[in-house]
Curated annotation (Swiss-Prot):
Positions bound to ATP: T29, I30, G31, P32, D86, G87, T88, T89, T90, G413, N478, A479, A480, D494
Reaction(s) catalysed by this chain's protein: ATP + H2O + a folded polypeptide = ADP + phosphate + an unfolded polypeptide
One GO cellular component term: cytoplasm
EC class (word): isomerase
Presence of keyword Cytoplasm: yes
Compartments, as annotated in UniProt: Cytoplasm
Gene responsible for this protein: groEL
PANTHER family associated with the record: 60 KDA HEAT SHOCK PROTEIN, MITOCHONDRIAL
Organism classification: Bacteria, Bacillati, Bacillota, Bacilli, Lactobacillales
Biological source species: Oenococcus oeni (strain ATCC BAA-331 / PSU-1)
Protein name: Chaperonin GroEL
Keyword Chaperone set for record: yes
Quaternary structure note: Forms a cylinder of 14 subunits composed of two heptameric rings stacked back-to-back. Interacts with the co-chaperonin GroES.
GO terms classed as biological process: protein refolding
GO molecular function: ATP binding; ATP-dependent protein folding chaperone; isomerase activity; unfolded protein binding
Length: 541
């Protein structure tokens, strides 16, 4: 396929057009008075959302150069989402602001490499300022405030605060669709461990890259599975019952894994496989924990058990299993309750008797997994469209809350960025030439989230941003009520991790775009010429 190469200003201008198209769609959603965006689906009803990364991923532009620009902004949003779980719209707004201001200076003759250096120095100063102004999460009310702000819904905030109170800050919280219209919280027995699917072909939900197994059997073994014939008898038994199967094994090698994947893709049976958690003796203990939770027998040579002899009675069962690329969550294992209680009691006794801090920590992790349970938020809504939108909001709120527990929180509504402007200005004033220009670009960009929040509320962003700079620290503009308040006292807060990640990723992607000197793209396909008109056929006798 032939390629086209564009250079310098021409290349950057085309990419900038794509950045603006994507960012203009995403930034309408920021703040308490942000709007929704409707996304067309290849089938079914459109999705309505205000989730920045979902909108960004849905944008595909016809022009190759514009599309590359849009995809680079999507990268900033996605990275922020991966690290902090929220803040994708903020990352997009900051990226657009830095790129647009930076391109003006590059076009005017500034050196992009110097500008990049200034952006990096100013970002480092801004991050230090955010960390200095951060407050620790101390109680359930802080959690509720953060979740409420992220979801723009007080009921959702209360729900997530309740869930965290019941299973702990590090507890497992999953989000499922309810059959009714009410959104409820339920705490069930379950556990999570740090192992993901062995192959992405096991994925059942391509949007979230998750594998969901309803009412599955579980085959648990500390052995390697290298030959599909070893597990064929038990596979056939599972297929006959029309159930799905989760295999937890030391490893699946040789032709066994491709055979499982092929049969999954053909629809012969629904299967997924993950590696066993832990190592050595701890692996054996964790496998036994999972077995007791689900009512399985661990297939191990220590007990003289072979894979080829496994029967369906030795498999575990659960109500639901969710697997991502790095975690597996088992919800409502169907094991014996008495055996589970005995196992928990045994682990507690080991914790009391051990003299090793490391062993105690690992035992406490196992205890939390077994005894803590899983909080299930069942999302209800009147329509499919509302259900999806609500689910996105709850996921964002949960991610934001976890981020706040991890690194604390800062004043929300764009106020945290305005509060660190004096510190970043000190750095900018100490620099020279194009490096100083780069730092001042970040200075101006720090006002942009507040401006956009205010403009989405129908007010003049520049006027509010100017006043915000002269206010006391943590005093900001509440766009929901139109009042100036202490943002911390009013419960308008953002997780430090989300705010920091949004700025760092925006600065990183923007610096790459500004230092781009050539862009290579495929030439647009030319339509084949229409067939010539053959004219009329001669008459027939």
């Amino acid at each position: 396929m032939a390629k086209e190469v564009r250079f310098s200003e021409d290349a950057r201008t085309r990419m900038q057009a794509g950045i603006d198209k994507l960012a203009d769609a995403v930034k309408t959603t920021i703040g308490p008075k942000g709007r929704n965006v409707v996304l067309e689906q290849s089938y079914g009803t459109p999705t309505i959302t205000n989730d920045g990364v979902t909108i960004a991923k849905a944008v595909e532009l016809d022009d190759h150069y514009e599309n590359m620009g849009a995809k680079l902004v999507t990268e900033a949003a996605s990275k922020t989402n991966d690290v902090a779980g929220d803040g994708t719209t903020t990352a997009t707004v900051l990226t657009q602001a830095i790129v647009n201001e930076g391109l003006k200076n590059v076009t005017a003759g500034a050196n992009p490499v110097g500008i990049r250096s200034g952006i990096e120095k100013a970002t480092a100063a801004a991050v230090a300022g955010l960390n200095k102004n951060s407050h620790e999460v101390e109680d359930s009310s802080s959690i509720q405030q953060i979740a409420s702000i992220s979801a723009a819904n007080e009921e959702i905030g209360k729900l997530i605060a309740d869930a965290m109170e019941k299973v702990g800050h590090d507890g497992v919280i999953t989000i499922e669709e309810s059959k009714g219209i009410e959104t409820e919280l339920d705490v069930v027995e379950g556990m999570q461990f740090d192992r993901g699917y062995m192959s992405q072909y096991f994925v059942t939900d391509n949007d979230k890259m998750e594998t969901n197994l309803d009412n599955p059997y579980l085959l648990i073994t500390d052995q390697k599975i290298g030959n599909i014939q070893d597990i064929l008898p038990v596979l056939q038994s599972v297929v006959e019952q029309g159930r799905s199967l989760l295999i937890i094994a030391d490893d699946i090698t040789g032709e066994a894994l491709p055979t499982l994947v092929l049969n999954k893709l053909r629809g012969t049976f629904n299967v997924a496989a993950v590696k066993a958690p832990g190592f050595g003796d701890r692996r054996k203990a964790q496998l036994q924990d999972i077995a007791i939770l689900t009512g399985a027998t661990v297939v191990t040579e220590d007990l003289g058990l072979q894979l080829k002899d496994v029967t369906i009675d030795q498999l575990g069962q659960a109500n639901r299993v969710t697997i991502t690329k790095d975690k597996t969550t088992i919800v409502e294992g169907k094991g014996d309750k008495t055996a589970l209680a005995d196992r928990i009691k045994s682990i507690r006794q080991e914790i009391d008797s051990t003299t090793s801090d490391f062993d105690r920590e690992k035992l406490q992790e196992r205890l939390a997994k077994l005894a803590g349970g899983v909080a299930v938020v069942r999302v209800g809504a009147a329509t499919e469209t509302e259900l999806k939108e609500k689910k996105y909001r709850i996921e964002d709120a949960l991610n934001a809350t976890r981020a706040a527990v991890e690194e604390g929180f800062v004043a929300g509504g764009g106020t945290a960025f305005v509060n660190i402007i004096p510190e970043v200005k000190k750095v900018a004033d100490s620099l020279q030439g194009d490096v100083a220009t780069g730092a001042r670009i970040v200075l101006r960009a720090l006002e942009e989230p507040l401006r956009q929040i205010v403009e989405n509320a129908g007010l003049e962003g520049s006027v509010i941003a100017q006043r915000a700079k002269s206010e006391k620290p943590e005093v900001g503009f509440n766009a929901a009520t139109g009042e100036w308040v202490n943002m911390i006292d009013a419960g308008i807060v953002d997780p430090t991790k989300v705010t920091r990640s949004a700025l760092q990723n925006a600065a990183s992607v923007s610096a790459m775009i500004l230092t781009t000197e050539a862009v290579v793209a495929e030439l647009p396909k030319k339509d084949a010429p229409a067939a010539p008109n053959a004219g009329g056929m001669p008459g027939m006798m």
